[in-house]
C-alpha cells in the first residue's frame, strides 16, 4: 500500500514547504484542482525538483468524450504520474481517453472517479437515484473494461471492486484519518487498519499530515504502520 499526501494548502510556498519536509520518504504527492488552477503546470515541476516525487494530479476530468481525451493528453504531458477522470462520463468517454493516451510513449496511470467520499447514502441517492456500493461496483466494472488502471473509491468499496474486476485493478482511497482524526467534510472515512484489511493500493492523507506540527513525523508513523 502506497501513501499519497494531499497538498491542499493555501499557497504553493506552503505546499513546497511540506514537500521538502517529506524529502526522502516513499510517498506520492496529490495536487488538486485549487493548486493546479492557482499555480499551473510549473508547480508539478517544482514538486518533482524537490525530490522527484510521483505526482497524482487530481482534476477529476469530466466533459464530453473528445474534450476529455484532449484534456487528458495535455495533462499527461506535464509530468503527472497518475490522473483521474469521472466514470459517470460514461463508457465512450473513458474509451476515448484510453485510446488517446495509448498513443503516448509513457502515459500516466488513469483512475476512474466513482462516488466522492463526501457523499453519504442519502446525498448520493438524491443525485443518482441509486445505492453507493452498487453504483461504485458498476462504475468499476465499466472502467476496468475500458482499460483504466484503477478507481478512486472509499475504503469500504475496495474489496468489492477487486472481486468484481481484478486484484490488480488499483483502488485509491481518500478519506483516510490515520489515527482517528476529525472527519471534516468527508463522510465515508476510515483508519489505516481498515484500509489495509480492505486491500487499498493507495491511501490519501491530507489534513492529518499538513496540519500537524511535524508533517514528517506523522508521515513516518503512517509509513511504519502500512509497511
From Swiss-Prot:
Binding site for substrate: 8, 30, 58-67, 117, 177, 186, 206-207
Catalytic reaction annotation: orotidine 5'-phosphate + H(+) = UMP + CO2
One of the protein's GO biological processes: 'de novo' UMP biosynthetic process
MF annotations from Gene Ontology: orotidine-5'-phosphate decarboxylase activity
Positions of transmembrane segments: none
Cystine crosslinks: none
Active site: residue positions: 60 (proton donor)
Top-level taxon in the UniProt lineage: Bacteria
Family matches, as Pfam families: OMPdecase
Pathway: Pyrimidine metabolism; UMP biosynthesis via de novo pathway; UMP from orotate: step 2/2
One annotated Gene Ontology cellular component of this protein: cytosol
EC number: 4.1.1.23
Enzyme class: lyase
Keyword Lyase among UniProt keywords: yes
Keywords: Decarboxylase, Lyase, Pyrimidine biosynthesis
CDD domains: OMP_decarboxylase_like
Cited function: Catalyzes the decarboxylation of orotidine 5'-monophosphate (OMP) to uridine 5'-monophosphate (UMP).
Classification via NCBIfam families: PRK00230.1 (NF001273), pyrF (TIGR01740)
PANTHER family named in the record: OROTIDINE 5'-PHOSPHATE DECARBOXYLASE
Annotated HAMAP family: OMPdecase_type1_B (MF_01200_B)
Subunit-structure text: Homodimer.
Family indicated by similarity: Belongs to the OMP decarboxylase family. Type 1 subfamily.
Name of the protein: Orotidine 5'-phosphate decarboxylase
Species, as recorded: Campylobacter fetus subsp. fetus (strain 82-40)
Amino acid at each position: 500500500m502506497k501513501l499519497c499526501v494531499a497538498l491542499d494548502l493555501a499557497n504553493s510556498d506552503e505546499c513546497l514547504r511540506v514537500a521538502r519536509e517529506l524529502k526522502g520518504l516513499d510517498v506520492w504527492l496529490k495536487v488538486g484542482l485549487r493548486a493546479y488552477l492557482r499555480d499551473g503546470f510549473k508547480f508539478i515541476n517544482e514538486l518533482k525538483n524537490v525530490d522527484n516525487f510521483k505526482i497524482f494530479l487530481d482534476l477529476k476530468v469530466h466533459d464530453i468524450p473528445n474534450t476529455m481525451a484532449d484534456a487528458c493528453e495535455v495533462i499527461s504531458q506535464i509530468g503527472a504520474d497518475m490522473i483521474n477522470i469521472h466514470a459517470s462520463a460514461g463508457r465512450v468517454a473513458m474509451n476515448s481517453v484510453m485510446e488517446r493516451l495509448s498513443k503516448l510513449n509513457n502515459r500516466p496511470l488513469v483512475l476512474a472517479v466513482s462516488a466522492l467520499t463526501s457523499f453519504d447514502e442519502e446525498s448520493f441517492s438524491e443525485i443518482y437515484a441509486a445505492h453507493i456500493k452498487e453504483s461504485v461496483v458498476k462504475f468499476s466494472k465499466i472502467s476496468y473494461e475500458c482499460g483504466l488502471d484503477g478507481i478512486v473509491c472509499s475504503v469500504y468499496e475496495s474489496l468489492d471492486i477487486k472481486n468484481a474486476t481484478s486484484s490488480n485493478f488499483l483502488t485509491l482511497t481518500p478519506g483516510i484519518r490515520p489515527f482517528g482524526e476529525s472527519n471534516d467534510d468527508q463522510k465515508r472515512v476510515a483508519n489505516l487498519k481498515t484500509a489495509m484489511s480492505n486491500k487499498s493500493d493507495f491511501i490519501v492523507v491530507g489534513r492529518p499530515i499538513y496540519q500537524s506540527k511535524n508533517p514528517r513525523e506523522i508521515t513516518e508513523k503512517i509509513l511504519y504502520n502500512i509497511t
